[in-house]
Amino acid sequence: MKFEKATIKDINMLTDLRLVYLQEDLGVITDKQLIQESLPGYYEKHLNKDLMVYVARDDEDIIACAFLLIVEKPMSPSFITGKTGTALNVYTKPEYRNKGYAKKLMTMMLEDAPEQDVSVIELKSTEDGYLLYKSVGFEDVVVKYHNMKIVLK
């Protein structure tokens, strides 16, 4: 097994893994074709710039991945560099699960993030992933704010 950052050559596999992840997480994806057509361009624009993707390979096949999306915003005492990260799309193909691959990828992410000047990494955890994230140092967050959103499209 080889653990490394994804490169531009991995765009097709990353697109496929993202779609599989979304289907497992959400069920039926109504805009699947649009997502499939748009993701390669997104990866070309962002990969290894403000999107780091850590992958596990079995030969050339990517069998697990973890994404770190880096955003720069006005600094605050809670993110003093102004750069925050969001961990997402942590996914392992079913036949490779429970072997520690996701933990290795998360550890790589946490070691690499300070080199990217990231102050803090946040994530939303499923029940399945909760213990994994706790094991690498993530903590539950109690906030005084309400999480809100508005859907525009």
Give the label of every model feature segment.
Residues 96-108:
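Conserved acetyl-CoA pyrophosphate-binding loop and the N-cap/start of the following alpha-helix
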Residues 55, 61-70, 86, 91:
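Conserved beta-strand in the GNAT
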